[in-house]
A protein has these predicted regions:
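A solvent-exposed, acidic/Ser-Thr-rich amphipathic alpha-helical stretch
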Residues: 12, 28-99
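Conserved small/polar residues in nucleotide/adenosyl-binding loops
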Residues: 144-146
Length: 146
């Protein structure tokens, strides 16, 4: 059974990943490798279909594969020309507030707001819905992100 603690952990990992990508980009480090790891370890690409609809995507609204998801975060591979690199905007913190959860044996849903802290210390509020699946190693991976 997926627990609240499992959801808290995967959400913390997701937020920490966004901050790590932003920090590496700001410091001239290999942010693309960090972003690749972020998508590889937190999304279910390669395991099942992933329903990813990034908030700021308007032309290429849906990201059904790994490369299109990576493009949204770092805009490094020219997969989706509209992308500007959401994760390289300098975010210094990400926090989640779940409105509600649905927990199952090998799946879970979470809906709420997450708050991205800008370099100036302002918070940007965005709504989310994540769907998760447990893989064969017991990892909780996102298969829905809208």
């Amino acid at each position: 059974m997926v627990s609240v603690s499992d959801i808290d952990s995967v959400q913390k990992a997701w937020g920490d990943g966004i901050v790590a990508i932003a920090s590496a980009h700001s410091n001239g480090e290999d942010y693309v490798s960090i972003a690749r790891n972020h998508v590889e370890t937190l999304y279910a690409y390669g395991l099942t279909n992933v329903l990813f609809k990034p908030t700021l995507a308007a032309i290429e609204q849906f990201r059904p594969n790994f490369e299109s998801a990576l493009s949204y975060f770092v805009a490094s591979n020219n997969e989706c020309p509209e992308d500007k690199g959401f994760a390289i905007k300098g975010w210094t913190n990400v926090r989640f507030e779940n409105a509600d959860l649905i927990l199952g044996d090998s799946t879970a849903l979470a809906m709420g707001n997450y708050f991205f802290t800008t370099p100036e210390g302002d918070e940007v509020k965005v709504e989310y819905t994540f769907g998760y699946i447990v893989d064969s190693s017991g990892n909780l991976l996102s298969l829905i992100h809208i």
